[in-house]
Amino acid sequence: MTENYRDSGTLLIRNSDIKEGQFLFSENPIHLDEEFAEKNKTRRLQIGDVVTVHTGDIGTSAVIEEKEAGAIGFATINTRTDKSILNPYFLATYFNTEKHKCYANSVSTGDGRSNYNIKDFNKLVISVPTLDEQERISVLINAINIIITLHQQEPFLCGNSVNGGRKLCSQ
């Protein structure tokens, strides 16, 4: 497949691009040749699809938003929900929990790198609250994750070489 890599074209989502609740691409993300991507159009991701790590940090998931729409994920586990029953952000939030990751690791295979088999992924049973509750849970967990991220970034923002040594925070 590497012969179809390009500097521009259809974005390729790799397992390493998927972080908890978000996609973090390298400075130069991999793109695919448009003709090759068109031949594989059934793999194109749509807004609201949940993309889950298949190899590596298995179980980690994020939701496709506008900037990733149309991308392709070949080596990822891709889930499209019926949004009248299951909020994709709730599903991704659940996939990122310790409970789900413990399950994923307990059924993983591989020699050195963990693999989450589709067969085991499809056996997963999830308790699904009402859509309203799913929305509230997703919003709350996302807000907590933003606060955690900001606290993790604080040392980089509070007077070090990254910002020229200026003290930006009171300590």
Where are these regions (language model features)?
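Feature detects amphipathic, helix-rich regulatory segments
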Residues: 1-171
